[in-house]
Design a protein with these regions (language model features):
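Short, contiguous acidic and Ser/Thr-rich linear segments
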Residues: 20-25
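Intrinsically disordered, low-complexity regulatory regions in eukaryotic proteins
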Residues: 1-17, 28-220
Length: 220
């Protein structure tokens, strides 16, 4: 996995001057950097290359003259500093050719920040390992959760996925409970391929719609 240099039009550094005080307990100084995260992928590593051009009074250590500043995507609901997981439990209903097949579902869901009020998750019981997810997987299984001002959630596909919300704000919303836990409540259906179906005698696969009703709690 390779890092990418963040294009200069995606960030702003108002001043390149900083002061490291002689009596400071810290051995570093800070620069203000503003980044526009819209359109950046949570699956990529972005770097801003910086170099000390000149200093006063002292000589520059050539071994410590350059730094790669890593941009970490983060919002209120997830961060890429470390992988964010929501422990999700609920009901899965497969709408098969032999009728509805209901099962309980439990999945540790990866939640990735996309913008200030949007995250990306995979539908159903599908999941992935950060750093190994493919564009094809995202296109097939990825959906966006947009958290609106009233804390209702709008569900949209990342790519070719067929997904539909069920109900309204009373079924799809975000809250922080009395214990301070962050929770997503979701109710939706999506179309999946090669779904395993079993009856009393046989097991086979078919394409069908699957309805999910779930509650996801952010793991600490």
């Amino acid at each position: 996995k390779f890092a990418k240099e963040l294009k200069s039009d995606r960030y702003n550094i108002p001043t390149y001057r900083t002061v490291l005080k002689a009596d400071s307990e810290d051995n570093y100084a800070l620069l203000p950097i503003t980044v526009n995260p819209d359109g950046l992928s949570p699956d990529s590593i972005y770097m801003i290359p910086l170099r000390i051009k000149s200093i006063s009074n002292y000589e520059i250590n050539p071994d410590k003259q350059q730094v790669l500043y890593q941009v970490v995507l983060k919002n209120e609901y997830a961060t890429m500093e470390s992988t964010t997981h929501y422990q999700t439990a609920g009901t899965e209903i497969k709408h098969t050719t032999i009728g509805e097949k209901a099962n309980g579902s439990n999945v540790t869901r990866v939640v990735a920040p996309i913008s200030k009020n949007r995250v990306r998750v995979f539908v159903g019981t599908h999941t992935y390992t950060p750093g190994k997810v493919t564009k094809e997987d995202i296109d097939k299984y990825g959906m966006y959760l947009t958290i609106n001002d009233d804390k209702s959630i709008t569900i949209t596909p990342c790519g070719s996925l067929q997904v539909e919300m069920i109900g309204g704000a009373e079924d799809n919303y975000y809250e922080v409970d009395k214990k301070g836990r962050q929770i997503f409540y979701l109710h939706y259906k999506y179309f999946d391929t090669n779904v395993t179906v079993t009856d009393d005698k046989n097991t086979w696969t078919e394409d069908c719609w699957i309805t999910m009703e779930e509650k996801g709690i952010r793991s600490l």
